């Protein structure tokens, strides 16, 4: 089984995705970690497997591939050299919305060459409604609908899965995290915590637990906007 991870140097992949894949415990799993950072295979493994987090077998399953995400055809020869034409290739995309369209454009061309591809896109799906509609149109025009799945990793937390559907007149959601920017300056300067957390995670949770359709029934009484406690300090060192 071949899994291609776009955004492999990101925080989500490092903290959540790779540890989960290691627990999957499949010796037949081949992971192609795709990123824009100009680092060696050794440095990438040191980054994601620090503190002895990875078994030797799991480390051997990972191959780092550097790609130029500014090119129109992101994948090109480097991807196609590793794709399997006889089996399904699995693709996980955890990137800012502006880069997803280019990747879908490349993967569409692989589909035209009869490669079997299944794609999981991590939220956010577009940075605004217009971008989301453009991505949806791109998917529909190129017959990718049956091959693409949209994911919000918050909905797969066990305590969220266990929440029952219910009626409510008021809902308060608190997300308490110990981590800050953690090197995500570029991402947060373009997306921000409001889009990263509220319009995706919080609204998806609200929709999941509501017994009734929420369309036209939500009234926002108050909202508060802030930033990570050490944002300014981390901004300086992560530039």
Q: Where on the chain are the PLM-derived regions?
A:
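Secretory/organelle targeting and membrane-embedding segments
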Residues: 1-120, 125-239
